[in-house]
């Protein structure tokens, strides 16, 4: 099973450090931002220590890199032309950086927000942006992420994702990242009807479009449209449904990426939960007490 988490690509070790962090969690895949997600500052590709990282990945059984595009990319913006043009040009740069990592197959992208113009207008704008970016020669696919429906986010329904894909000329370079927290918060019933949700996705989008799974529990009840991640088994989705998802026959080949919150009462000393969460999801054994020394409460 390909399972891992978001890891940091920063400091002197860059991608090598990210691979070392992933290995410390027992991961077999990992997700990185190629720079800070909230700005456009980027280190040169030559500084990322890619050859050393690829060797370390091979030695430690880390099969694949998932790249996440920065949050500042909003292809759905219809009110500020400069924001849209920045999104288009910067996404193109991020694709080239992802390709340079060699082990990356997908770059996850939040489709965008219409900022008040409405879903139909926003979808058209996203299609326009993707058609400007994609040439058909890309070595990585843009994985459109399913969204929770917070604010004016586009991508909260499978129909919206399908509409974007249908409008893009080189849509063979598009895939989908299914985020469990987002799908739950958008109203889909992963707890009682996982097969029904996947059948609906297959009918509307196509199950073969799935490229990445973001595995997150949710602090919110189903349909809340709030997008607040929780540690595996401690949220409203629960451990058993998430365990079923990561082991589902139709999803077995996909990289599963955890984006759950760090643990600890002191904001300066919080620690990553990923080693424990990966181990629990692999084994199927949920430990409701493992956070106690760090947070002081169980579920």
UniProtKB/Swiss-Prot annotation:
Keywords: DNA damage, DNA repair, Endonuclease, Hydrolase, Metal-binding, Nuclease, Zinc. It catalyses: Endonucleolytic cleavage to 5'-phosphooligonucleotide end-products. The lineage of its organism: Bacteria, Bacillati, Bacillota, Bacilli, Bacillales. Signal peptide: none annotated. Binds 3 Zn(2+) ions. Gene3D superfamilies: Divalent-metal-dependent TIM barrel enzymes. The keyword Metal-binding applies. It is an enzyme of class 3 (hydrolase). Zn(2+) 3 binds at residues 182, 227, 229. PROSITE patterns: AP_NUCLEASE_F2_1, AP_NUCLEASE_F2_2, AP_NUCLEASE_F2_3, AP_NUCLEASE_F2_4. InterPro entries: AP_endonuc_2 (IPR001719), AP_endonuc_F2_Zn_BS (IPR018246), Xyl_isomerase-like_sf (IPR036237), Xyl_isomerase-like_TIM-brl (IPR013022). Zn(2+) 2 binds at residues 145, 179, 214, 259. Its cofactor is Zn(2+). One of its GO terms (biological process) is base-excision repair. Zn(2+) 1 binds at residues 68, 110, 145. It comes from Exiguobacterium sibiricum (strain DSM 17290 / CCUG 55495 / CIP 109462 / JCM 13490 / 255-15). This is Probable endonuclease 4. One of its GO terms (molecular function) is zinc ion binding. Endonuclease IV plays a role in DNA repair. It cleaves phosphodiester bonds at apurinic or apyrimidinic (AP) sites, generating a 3'-hydroxyl group and a 5'-terminal sugar phosphate. Its EC number is 3.1.21.2. Belongs to the AP endonuclease 2 family. The keyword Hydrolase applies.
